[in-house]
Amino acid sequence: MSVVNFYGQLSNTQQFDQIRINIASPDQVRSWSFGEVTKPETINYRTFKPEKDGLFCARIFGPVKDYECLCGKYKRMKNRGITCEKCGVEVTVSRVRRERMGHIELAAPVAHIWFLKSLPSRISTLLDMTMRDVEKILYFENYVVVDPGLSILQKGELLTEEELQKAKDKYGEDAFTASIGAEVIQQMLKEIDFLKLKQELYEELQTTSSEVKKKKLVKRLKLVEDFLESENKPEWMIMDVLPVIPPEIRPLVMLDGGRFATSDLNELYRRVINRNNRLKKLIESKAPDIIVRNEKRMLQEAVDALFDNGRRGRAAKNANKRPFKSLSDMLKGKQGRFRQNLLGKRVDYSGRSVIVVGSELKLHQCGLPKKMALELFKPFIYSKLELYGIATTIKAAKRMVEAEKPEVWDVLEEVIREHPVLLNRAPTLHRLGIQAFEPLLIEGKAIQLYPLVCAAFNADFDGDQMAVHIPLSIEAQLEARVFMMSTNNILSPANGRPIIVPDKDIVLGLYYLTLAFDNEVGEGMMFSDLAEMEHALYNKFITIHTKIKYRRNQLNAEGKMVPVIIDTTYGRLMVGELLPSNPNIEFKFINKQLTKKDISLVIDLVYRHCGQKATVIFADQLMKLGFKYACSSGISFGMDDMVVPESKSTHINETQLEIKEFEQQYSNGLITYGEKYNKVVDAWSRCTDRVANDMMKEIATPPVSDDPNHQKINAIYMMAISGARGSFQQIKQLGGMRGLMTKSNGQIIQTPIISNFKEGLTEFECFNSANGMRKGQIDTALKTASSGYLTRKLVDVAQDCIITEKDCGTDKGIEVKSVIEGGEVIVPLAEKILGRTAAIDIFHPVTNDLILNKGELINEAKLEQIESAGLDRIMIKSVLTCESTTGICSICYGRDLATGTLVSEGEAIGVIAAQSIGEPGTQLTMRTFHIGGAATKGAEVSSVEASYDAKVKIISRNVVINSEERKIVMSRNCELLLLDNNGNEKARHKIPYGARLLVDDGDMVIKTQKLAEWDPYTIPIITEKSGKVLFKDMVEGISIRDVTDEATGIPSKVIIESKQYSRGAELRPRIQLLDAKGEVIALSNGLEARYYLPVGAVLSVEDGVQISVGDIIARIPKESTTTKDITGGLPRVAELVEARRPKDHAVIAEIDGRVEFGKDYKSKRRIIIHPIDETMSIEYMVPKGKHVVVNEGDFVKKGDLLIDGNPVLQDILKVMGVEVLANYIVKEVQAVYRLQGVKIDDKHIEVIIRQMLQKVEITDSGGTTLLAGEKIDRHEFEEINEKAIKNGLKPAEAQLILQGITKASLQTRSFISAASFQETTRVLTEAAIAGKIDKLRGLKENVIVGRLVPAGTGYFMDKMRKAAVKLDEENV
């Protein structure tokens, strides 16, 4: 017996390994067919029987009723296989009407619209004509010269009717041949000799130098090669015969009232048949040419409408003016075959109902209404009733169940025992949206859900509904129990943190329980056991908040119990009792006021040290305790709890005075409108924060009172600080001031809302506020869709990313260090490397001991060693550098975040990555409005303070001392580092050009000491020498103009876009410095002291004045800032993963070198970089209005910005390489999510980046058959090169290219997956021509063909089956 049969027989429809798609030849279409459809009739209106030779003909397609011919001569099974001589129908099952096809012999050839109109048009590419021209021939507008003969006409030249007539008159009737219609196109395609054409194109490609031509040739060559490889004939793109799909797939259904509902396809087929028959008649009766031609054109249009209605010309519409649904429409879009029926099927054995809280349940249980369970488990109940002899037949069992006999309930209890059910809440944004539970039968009609799983489902109990699904087979039950049971999904796959965390009221209850108050009854009493304390509490000697001393036995590291005396409260001890005993989980972790964060950390600890079971029990008990005390605390709040601070009016008055001063400065012309705007917004931001801080102080410490019933802590404060509900943002609006609001375009309104909700808003404030809130609401609605679309694109690009082996053996890795922004460590190194594997052996920098072996997983214990060693950067393995050919290896991926262990083979990490990135997107967009449009804008940073006691190190220090003896930074890339005693970097700050340095290299500084300060709203231009100012090229009204401010009447000189000056001379406004002799001063780098001024710069000096070193000669105002919230964020994430060019993108230097400004060209500035080794210099042309961040003579490094903005990803890849690119994308995406407090592991983003970097572009074909400019898969490229080297040929060269996720999805190796994503017709057209083969490697294509996905258990079955086949072959 063969081994492979052990794994169960594959059904007939599943015995294939790959799927190939081709163009069908006319003979193939005829071979599928069971007969020609010649009549447009469908069924007889009286007898309702199909008409003979019509679209539903029983002779062609099979009998209407099982085993019964049409005329009724043969009935019953016994006549199976007989063909009735009277009506010609074969006696068989009526199911064949779903399989049998027919055909229509067309009277004239017709072009297939997909190959004609689907861009790029294949027919026109092959014939080397424009699509417009091909259409003119096909639709009988123009003739084409097939054979010029004796005339001087060109082959392939188009002629109108008149031109043809003229040519005939000129050269004679038979001098040349010109023809029209699909026949001529078919003939021209037939005549193509591919091998010859390929050679010609190849030679032309070698000789041509034009880039445009090259691109065109490569496209044509690719198409020719596709045809050669697939053995498709080009003339098959023109059809002589049309397939008719089986009638059951385009049904005609009778409605009550004698009317019929029919599929649109029947109508479209009828039009084709009618026109075809008419054409046949016309040809037979030798009708005039013009009539025949018109009929042929109409036939072409009818076939076009059948295949793809509306693609060309006006769509064919039905009586109600609704376009017919053609064959293409059946496949396309959300309602098409792929997405509606193949990827998303409806499921039987399912029910749905409203959910309610099941606080008495255990984590692995859910309450299922009895009625629902009875319906869902029917088949199981029937079989059990029969098995026990309670019912004799299935019918009897059915009756018993319908009557709801008492014994049925007993059987139901037994059937349900340990049979898990799946609960799902839509939208299912990540895999935790479907989990398995064991059902408990309950009365009522609502499903009961365990409260702690709400976070994973994002469910609340305000009327949410959930669906129940029943896993039927034993394998399905097993998978549900092992993989999907809620107890096995404690950690979130997105970030590895517990997702079963108490929330809302539970958190509030636990916070209340762990509060400790001063001066409570019985403070300082000593206890040694809990019973004693309970007694004291019962008799009111203490309260749960009294500070007491307690002797507690604790496990030490050796595993012995040691008594320790701790200061605590009874409430905290109650939580402490629930902790599992483990030396790593000390009482100190909960001996504090427990907030949501603390509870989460404790649950994490328990999971890491005590395992899953202990965690589940601990979380469950915490929940019960939290609910109990949330109830008995009786926390509520009223108006008095919203405290308005006394100092509010003082702060507001101060700010108003400040703003008056800004207005004054503005009216005196000292600052521009933009600067004033920024300063005003900033001042109000600070004021709002100050008011909020004062309010927080007042709320946090309620007034002291002798009243024993006095509230010791503010309820609102408690809710916010514990993390139960609300944020300080919202409390600020209740009791402080609402602060600044945004306009609908995202700009901040200068006048803030001074009132809060307690005092109430004025009419004007209310209007502004409503405006901001409305924006939030609209954003929410719009962003939900775009976020869902982003998730879909991400899943599609990453769906075939699966762990396929343990170790790929690569030595490569990426270097990571902690993320430092504004001198603060935002993401410590520890967080970035936890759960990754080391790429090299890692040693202690001082003692040189080995900390980690290469390829070893970095777990919590190793982290502590790395942190104590003070390492600040580490090489880790990454999916970006993994060298597995299919999929990714476990070692490069690292820890599976949902289990905390090394990822196992077969895990679908691509989908998990996509869900982890996409899910919070939707979450966040649903949450923009919680702040209600209040602007959240931090005041601009204008100085740097030391965050530690440390030593200063300054990188690229270029400083001048100005007239006030201040140190002014002149370098564009100055950085200030703070180092600890070992010389490790603790913080890093970028110091902008023009800042005042308050410390110097090598200084020791103390914490909070100011290091540097600057004006955040303008970019200054500063002199580095003293001298006399000379204005150059500043022509009033042309390159410079006095801008008189309307409000103040004060003129200031501003550089404007220079218009054409006399005789096209370019104006380049600049300031030169002259010495006493009137000559231009030379700078330290040998260049002359010239300062070019960009458009928009405001001059700070007059012509001819004397200035000294470090003075500001002009200011460039910065744009005023708009608010940041995730709506800015989601499009940013999409922009990154789609690899789009950002609007106003930066320009980056490709080499190290010195900057020089060349001669301007029209509206562009020319920046030239001269490398040090004086090789080729590189020029950049940039628009004049853009702000150039470098000065003439500056030295730039490769990758530095020349122009401000977000860099283009493709540039980063080209200049800096994959690692820098990956770091940049990860950093940017993380910044968006971090703003919202969402944590996603870096590796998920890396998986997506890996998928974006799958293709290479050939730069030099070497000795291979590849073409320069062709884009192919990375692994394919490596295989081709290996072959070339084996055969002694020169290998090809290529460069990695970055593709956006949509493009990458459409170019996957699997055409089925690509077709089901987007642009279905285009993908299928392309695949059919190339005769593509789908190896069915990814998840989507397997779902579509109805198999188990090759991930998880399916992956192992696949693996075992392959091994079994191998064994069988060996045995044979």
Swiss-Prot record:
Protein residues bound to Mg(2+): 460, 462, 464
Protein name: DNA-directed RNA polymerase subunit beta'
NCBIfam families xrefs: rpoC_TIGR (TIGR02386)
The protein's Enzyme Commission number: 2.7.7.6
The species this protein was found in: Rickettsia felis (strain ATCC VR-1525 / URRWXCal2)
InterPro entries tied to this protein: DNA-dir_RpoC_beta_prime (IPR045867), DNA-dir_RpoC_beta_prime_bact (IPR012754), RNA_pol_asu (IPR000722), RNA_pol_N (IPR006592), RNA_pol_Rpb1_1 (IPR007080), RNA_pol_Rpb1_3 (IPR007066), RNA_pol_Rpb1_3_sf (IPR042102), RNA_pol_Rpb1_4 (IPR007083)
Family, as annotated: Belongs to the RNA polymerase beta' chain family.
GO cellular component terms, A-Z: DNA-directed RNA polymerase complex
